[in-house]
Amino acid sequence: AQYFTVRDPRFAAQVAAWQSAGVAARWPAAGPDAWVGTPGMNAPVKAMAARHAVSWQTRIEALEARNGAWQLRGAGDAGRFDAVVVALPAEQAAELVRSVHPRFADRAAALPSAPCWTVMLAFSEPIPTDRHIVREAGAIGWATRDGSKPGRGDAETWVVQATPAWSAAHLELAPEDAAGRLLPQFEAAIGTALPPLCHLSAHRWRYAR
């Protein structure tokens, strides 16, 4: 996500606490109710995780309901838990829960996700434009001047996301080919010549939304 919004009063109280702790801030360029993590989007998650014993980069491949608890299994035994929250793309959720909740798995499998190619750009100097966000322009679904977000520093960096249709049509491209094809699309969308690149890379999110 490029940003998050706050509408529920309980969430608003939490975001106010994050703001006081310096891990969230408003991002006016995206609108009056847009917020981002600072210095990165994962800062609020890191702040919450600091209060708990969290296992990162742990692959869970199976769930078992046993004696009123949940047994998680991956490369080894991941432990027993009172509850499981599944926050995965529908395709992956269906595979994970099928043995314990086939009806839920069927519903998840019927909701395919759309892919997204994302390109990360850094330039040697600022792009001569006052635009910080580009929406729905040709193959570009969303482009953000990442340096316009609070806490990001002064570097001229952009994150460019292709539309779902373009991403699906070019799903199996190599990352460098996807980046190379989207760069001129971004230049056309921004409406001005781009300065020299310092960095260009791409990542494919197969299950983006």
Go through each PLM region and give its residues.
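Central helical "cap/lid" subdomain
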Residues: 78-132, 192-195
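Short beta-strand to alpha-helix junction loop
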Residues: 3-7, 24-49, 169-181
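Generic structural signal for small/hydrophobic residues in well-ordered secondary structure
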Residues: 4, 48, 85-87, 121, ...
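Active-site substrate-recognition segment that forms the wall
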Residues: 120-191
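Catalytic phosphate/metal-binding cores of nucleic-acid and nucleotide-processing enzymes, i.e., regions
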Residues: 26, 62, 200
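Flavin (FAD/FMN) cofactor-binding core of flavoprotein oxidoreductases
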Residues: 187-209
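A short alpha-helix-loop-beta-strand transition element characteristic
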Residues: 1, 10-35, 57, 105, ...
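A conserved short coil-to-beta-strand element within the FAD-binding core of flavoproteins
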Residues: 56-71
